[in-house]
From Swiss-Prot:
It comes from the Eukaryota. Belongs to the nucleotide-sugar transporter family. CMP-Sialate:CMP antiporter (TC 2.A.7.12) subfamily. The keyword Chloroplast does not apply. Residues 1-51, 103-124, 196-210, 260-276, 335-352 are cytoplasmic. Its main location: Golgi. This is CMP-sialic acid transporter 4. Keywords: Golgi apparatus, Membrane, Sugar transport, Transmembrane, Transmembrane helix, Transport. It holds the Pfam family Nuc_sug_transp. InterPro entries: Nuc_sug_transpt (IPR007271). Sugar transporter involved in the transport of CMP-sialic acid from the cytoplasm into the Golgi. Essential protein. One of its GO terms (molecular function) is sialic acid transmembrane transporter activity. It comes from Arabidopsis thaliana (Mouse-ear cress). Residues 73-81, 146-174, 232-238, 298-313 are lumenal. One of its GO terms (biological process) is sialic acid transport.
């Protein structure tokens, strides 16, 4: 009996120890889950903050871009060569990317993800968007033979639809029905906001004009979506390395554009003929805008970029009221309202 009593006490102690260990295990497991959840939440907050910062930066830079372009003109004309300005934009973007990489190498050292040297398989895809943008920019000069400037701004909104369609086809990303409705409303809102007394001429645009507008929209949409695919193919790759290779080929194709369009003018008048302080500010703005675009593609997507640039268009019009005595029409307020509804629908579609 004494033996059984002692044995029962031992069994009870062992059971208590087992329960204690189980309790500790559950506590540790719960703690690990809580830590993991906290880590994921913190990471998501950082990503949202990063997306918000680069999107706001792109919106502000894009809205000021049009104002600087207007200021850079004299008597309604560019006294400087647009192609040389584009070349300098690419050069500055390369320099800024290298500067950022230099700081990273100094602070973190050289790793596989931030190493500038790369393989041919990784680099060979970067010339494609540069070539697409070159052809698109060349078409931009010829389309004005068939449509005026206000009409061109309206036809440019075809980029919105082409980006959405190519985003679905190339990246295999689905947009919800609500998001598609928001996207179509965005195109309608931007078009409505740009309507004026001369807008009826758009319907009178000839077949070559419409063809060029559609081709330009497809080139722009494809280049943007393809660039996003390149940048996101290797998520861990440092964005500054990817930017550098994108901009190097962009510089090369801009050099080709100088030879094709402005070789005689540059040879006779000089590379920097007609440049002013405003021109230099415009070049800096374009360079920073380009970097902001690539960061939006890296941390967000082309859809966010389209919304950002569309909101920037409206912001430019509002600022122009104070700078250029620009008068906002009823169509602008109606279009702005439609764009706001579109932004809400896109956000609501994501939440679902």
């Amino acid at each position: 009996m004494e033996y059984r009593k002692i044995k029962d006490e031992d069994d009870h102690d062992v059971a208590s120890d087992i329960e204690s260990v189980k309790g500790k295990s559950h506590t540790v497991a719960s703690s690990n889950i809580a830590m993991a959840t906290l880590g994921v939440g913190s990471s998501e907050r950082i990503n949202w903050k990063r997306k918000g910062v680069v999107t706001c930066a792109l919106t502000i830079l894009t809205s000021s871009q049009a104002i600087l372009i207007v200021w850079s003109k004299r008597a309604g004309k560019y006294e400087y060569s647009v192609t040389t300005a584009n070349f300098l934009v690419g050069t500055l973007k390369c320099a800024l990317s290298l500067l950022a990489l230099t700081r990273i190498w100094k602070n973190e050292g050289v790793t596989d993800d931030n190493r500038l040297s790369t393989t041919f398989d990784e680099v060979k895809v970067f010339p494609i968007p540069a070539a697409l943008y070159l052809f698109k920019n060349l078409l931009q000069y010829y389309i004005f033979a068939y449509v005026d400037a206000p009409g061109y701004q309206i036809l440019k909104n075809l980029n919105i639809i082409s980006t959405g369609v190519l985003y679905r086809i190339i990246l295999k990303r689905k947009l919800s029905e609500i998001q598609w409705a928001g996207f179509i409303l965005l195109c309608c809102g931007c078009t409505t906001a740009q309507l004026n007394s001369n807008s009826d001429r758009v319907l009178q645009t000839s077949l070559p004009g419409w063809t060029m507008a559609i081709v330009m929209a497809l080139l722009s949409g494809f280049a943007g979506v393809y660039t996003e695919a390149i940048i996101k193919k290797r998520p861990s790759r440092n964005i500054n390395v990817q930017n550098f290779w994108l901009y190097v080929f962009g510089m090369a194709f801009n050099a080709v554009a100088i030879v094709i369009q402005d070789f005689d003018a540059v040879a006779n008048k000089g590379f920097f003929h007609g440049y002013s302080f405003i021109t230099l500010l415009m070049i800096l703005n374009h360079a920073l805008s380009g970097i902001a675009v690539s960061m939006v593609m890296k941390y967000a997507d082309n859809i966010v970029k389209v919304y950002s640039t569309s909101v920037a268009m409206l912001l430019t019009a509002v600022v122009s009221v104070f700078l250029f005595n620009f008068h906002l029409s009823l169509a602008f307020f109606l279009g702005s309202t439609v764009v706001s509804v579109s932004v809400y629908l896109h956000s609501a579609g994501k939440l679902r």
